[in-house]
Protein backbone atom coordinates (compact mmCIF):
# COMPACT_ATOMS: atom_id res chain seq x y z
CA UNK A 1 0.00 0.00 0.00
CA UNK A 2 1.38 3.39 -0.99
CA UNK A 3 -0.16 6.28 0.98
CA UNK A 4 -0.23 9.69 -0.66
CA UNK A 5 1.41 12.68 0.97
CA UNK A 6 -2.06 14.14 1.57
CA UNK A 7 -3.13 10.98 3.39
CA UNK A 8 0.00 11.00 5.54
CA UNK A 9 -0.44 14.67 6.48
CA UNK A 10 -4.11 14.11 7.31
CA UNK A 11 -3.42 11.00 9.42
CA UNK A 12 -0.68 12.80 11.32
CA UNK A 13 -3.00 15.75 11.93
CA UNK A 14 -5.83 13.46 13.07
CA UNK A 15 -3.51 11.68 15.51
CA UNK A 16 -2.33 14.99 16.95
CA UNK A 17 -5.91 16.22 17.26
CA UNK A 18 -7.03 13.03 19.05
CA UNK A 19 -4.32 13.64 21.65
CA UNK A 20 -5.51 17.25 21.95
CA UNK A 21 -9.12 16.17 22.55
CA UNK A 22 -7.93 14.01 25.45
CA UNK A 23 -6.76 17.18 27.20
CA UNK A 24 -9.44 19.59 25.94
CA UNK A 25 -12.18 17.43 27.45
CA UNK A 26 -10.56 17.77 30.88
CA UNK A 27 -9.79 21.51 30.94
CA UNK A 28 -11.65 24.21 32.86
CA UNK A 29 -11.14 27.97 32.94
CA UNK A 30 -8.92 27.75 36.03
CA UNK A 31 -6.59 25.42 34.11
CA UNK A 32 -6.24 28.02 31.34
CA UNK A 33 -5.26 30.74 33.82
CA UNK A 34 -3.10 28.65 36.19
CA UNK A 35 0.40 30.08 36.56
CA UNK A 36 2.90 27.26 37.11
CA UNK A 37 5.73 29.64 38.02
CA UNK A 38 6.16 33.37 38.69
CA UNK A 39 7.87 33.86 35.31
CA UNK A 40 4.88 33.24 33.02
CA UNK A 41 3.29 34.49 29.89
CA UNK A 42 -0.47 34.49 30.26
CA UNK A 43 -3.56 36.38 29.13
CA UNK A 44 -4.92 39.44 30.94
CA UNK A 45 -8.34 41.06 31.05
CA UNK A 46 -7.90 44.63 29.86
CA UNK A 47 -10.04 47.64 30.72
CA UNK A 48 -11.71 47.37 27.28
CA UNK A 49 -13.01 43.89 28.20
CA UNK A 50 -10.64 41.99 25.90
CA UNK A 51 -8.30 39.25 27.09
CA UNK A 52 -4.87 39.91 25.58
CA UNK A 53 -1.59 37.99 25.83
CA UNK A 54 1.79 38.90 27.20
CA UNK A 55 4.11 39.55 24.25
CA UNK A 56 7.60 40.69 23.36
CA UNK A 57 8.97 41.27 19.86
CA UNK A 58 12.28 39.77 21.00
CA UNK A 59 12.35 36.50 22.89
CA UNK A 60 13.19 37.07 26.56
CA UNK A 61 15.96 35.17 28.30
CA UNK A 62 14.91 33.18 30.20
CA UNK A 63 11.79 32.42 28.20
CA UNK A 64 8.65 32.71 30.36
CA UNK A 65 6.59 29.55 30.86
CA UNK A 66 3.33 29.97 28.95
CA UNK A 67 -0.01 29.26 30.58
CA UNK A 68 -2.62 27.15 28.84
CA UNK A 69 -4.53 30.37 28.18
CA UNK A 70 -1.52 31.91 26.47
CA UNK A 71 -0.88 28.74 24.45
CA UNK A 72 -4.50 28.58 23.27
CA UNK A 73 -4.27 32.24 22.20
CA UNK A 74 -0.98 31.48 20.44
CA UNK A 75 -2.53 28.57 18.54
CA UNK A 76 -5.39 30.84 17.45
CA UNK A 77 -2.90 33.43 16.21
CA UNK A 78 -0.57 31.21 14.19
CA UNK A 79 -3.28 28.88 12.88
CA UNK A 80 -5.78 31.55 11.87
CA UNK A 81 -2.95 33.46 10.17
CA UNK A 82 -1.90 30.33 8.27
CA UNK A 83 -5.47 29.53 7.20
CA UNK A 84 -6.20 33.08 6.07
CA UNK A 85 -3.03 33.25 4.00
CA UNK A 86 -3.70 29.85 2.45
CA UNK A 87 -7.18 31.02 1.45
CA UNK A 88 -5.75 34.19 -0.10
CA UNK A 89 -7.14 36.51 2.55
CA UNK A 90 -5.37 39.12 4.65
CA UNK A 91 -4.90 37.75 8.18
CA UNK A 92 -5.78 39.78 11.23
CA UNK A 93 -2.96 41.54 13.03
CA UNK A 94 -1.68 39.75 16.12
CA UNK A 95 -2.97 42.62 18.25
CA UNK A 96 -6.50 42.01 16.97
CA UNK A 97 -6.66 38.42 18.20
CA UNK A 98 -8.03 38.23 21.73
CA UNK A 99 -8.36 35.19 23.97
CA UNK A 100 -12.06 34.27 24.38
CA UNK A 101 -12.03 34.64 28.18
CA UNK A 102 -12.98 31.18 29.40
CA UNK A 103 -12.48 27.47 28.74
CA UNK A 104 -15.68 27.05 26.76
CA UNK A 105 -14.83 29.89 24.38
CA UNK A 106 -11.19 28.87 24.00
CA UNK A 107 -11.99 25.21 23.34
CA UNK A 108 -14.75 26.22 20.93
CA UNK A 109 -12.34 28.45 19.03
CA UNK A 110 -9.73 25.69 18.79
CA UNK A 111 -12.35 23.30 17.43
CA UNK A 112 -13.44 25.93 14.88
CA UNK A 113 -9.85 26.23 13.71
CA UNK A 114 -9.68 22.46 13.36
CA UNK A 115 -12.76 22.46 11.12
CA UNK A 116 -11.36 25.30 9.00
CA UNK A 117 -8.03 23.49 8.63
CA UNK A 118 -9.76 20.22 7.70
CA UNK A 119 -11.43 22.15 4.89
CA UNK A 120 -7.99 23.21 3.70
CA UNK A 121 -6.53 19.70 3.99
CA UNK A 122 -9.49 18.03 2.31
CA UNK A 123 -9.11 20.30 -0.74
CA UNK A 124 -5.46 19.34 -1.27
CA UNK A 125 -4.05 16.89 -3.75
CA UNK A 126 -0.43 16.08 -4.47
CA UNK A 127 -0.19 18.83 -7.10
CA UNK A 128 -1.56 21.42 -4.65
CA UNK A 129 1.01 20.34 -2.07
CA UNK A 130 3.79 21.38 -4.46
CA UNK A 131 2.41 24.91 -4.95
CA UNK A 132 4.12 27.89 -3.34
CA UNK A 133 2.70 28.73 0.08
CA UNK A 134 2.39 32.28 1.39
CA UNK A 135 3.84 32.71 4.85
CA UNK A 136 4.08 35.62 7.26
CA UNK A 137 7.27 34.10 8.65
CA UNK A 138 9.33 34.63 5.50
CA UNK A 139 10.32 31.12 4.47
CA UNK A 140 10.88 32.20 0.87
CA UNK A 141 9.69 31.16 -2.59
CA UNK A 142 10.66 27.49 -2.19
CA UNK A 143 8.24 27.09 0.72
CA UNK A 144 5.37 24.86 -0.47
CA UNK A 145 1.90 24.03 0.78
CA UNK A 146 3.35 20.64 1.82
CA UNK A 147 5.88 22.45 4.02
CA UNK A 148 3.10 24.53 5.58
CA UNK A 149 0.87 21.52 6.26
CA UNK A 150 3.77 19.60 7.83
CA UNK A 151 4.65 22.67 9.93
CA UNK A 152 1.05 22.99 11.16
CA UNK A 153 1.18 19.35 12.28
CA UNK A 154 4.51 19.85 14.07
CA UNK A 155 3.57 23.17 15.70
CA UNK A 156 0.21 21.84 16.84
CA UNK A 157 1.83 18.68 18.21
CA UNK A 158 4.30 20.80 20.19
CA UNK A 159 1.55 23.05 21.57
CA UNK A 160 -0.65 20.05 22.43
CA UNK A 161 2.24 18.50 24.37
CA UNK A 162 2.82 21.77 26.23
CA UNK A 163 -0.87 22.09 27.14
CA UNK A 164 -1.06 18.45 28.19
CA UNK A 165 2.02 18.73 30.37
CA UNK A 166 0.71 21.88 32.08
CA UNK A 167 -2.68 20.25 32.68
CA UNK A 168 -1.10 17.14 34.19
CA UNK A 169 1.32 19.12 36.38
CA UNK A 170 -1.56 21.23 37.71
CA UNK A 171 -3.70 18.15 38.37
CA UNK A 172 -0.82 16.35 40.13
CA UNK A 173 0.10 19.38 42.24
CA UNK A 174 -3.44 19.95 43.50
CA UNK A 175 -4.09 16.35 44.47
Model-derived regions: residue spans:
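Acidic/histidine-rich alpha-helical segments that form the ligand environment
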Residues: 98-130, 147-157
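Short, contiguous alpha-helical
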Residues: 3-96, 134-175
